Regions:
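Accessory alpha-helical/coil subdomains and C-terminal extensions
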Residues: 12, 16-166
């Protein structure tokens, strides 16, 4: 039985891998709860899901829970993601929500965003360590903290202040 929560094995189009549906279902419930929390507390939640090489799980959760925005590494062909581009997308999402009168939301990101950051952006990160296979030790990088601070700085430059909470 093919087993991976990433759903990244070459199976027929309508066949998901063992474990993917369970992970998507649990993740969906969590994000739906965070959406309720975001609404009642008027906060933005930044959420990171598993998916170092593929954003299938994040996309599945984001679509099922109707997250405000879902970012997956596949959106950047070539795997050269600039940190500021990610921040710009998130800040623009916040601004668009404000135009709708909503100062809250849930931003869901696949951990592959960090894995595919531009080399210059990676070098600027604190605590960047790699394992014996050359993969970034994702747990050692406080990526959501980095995004949160960058978003707060950009929003402050626009005269806005938002409460943001990070979740992993």
């Amino acid at each position: 039985v093919p087993k991976t929560i990433d759903n990244d094995l070459p199976l027929p189009e309508d066949i998901t891998t063992f474990g993917f549906e369970t992970a998507r279902e649990v993740g969906t419930k969590l994000v739906m709860n965070l959406k309720k929390d975001a609404f009642t507390s008027r906060n933005w939640f930044l959420v990171m899901s598993m998916g170092r090489k593929a954003g299938h799980l994040a996309l599945g959760i984001g679509k099922s829970a109707m997250a405000t925005v879902t970012l997956i590494p596949e959106e950047w062909p070539g795997g050269n993601i600039r940190l500021q581009h990610v921040v710009d997308i998130l800040v623009m999402t916040v601004l668009l929500r404000l135009l709708e009168g909503k100062n809250y939301g849930v931003a869901l990101l696949a951990e592959g965003i960090l894995e595919n950051l531009d080399e210059q952006d990676l070098l600027a990160l604190d605590n960047l360590k790699r394992d014996e296979h050359g993969h970034i030790r994702l747990a050692d990088v406080n990526f959501l903290d980095i995004l949160k601070k960058a978003m707060e700085t950009d929003l402050a430059g626009l005269g806005l202040q938002m409460r943001m909470v990070k979740q992993v």
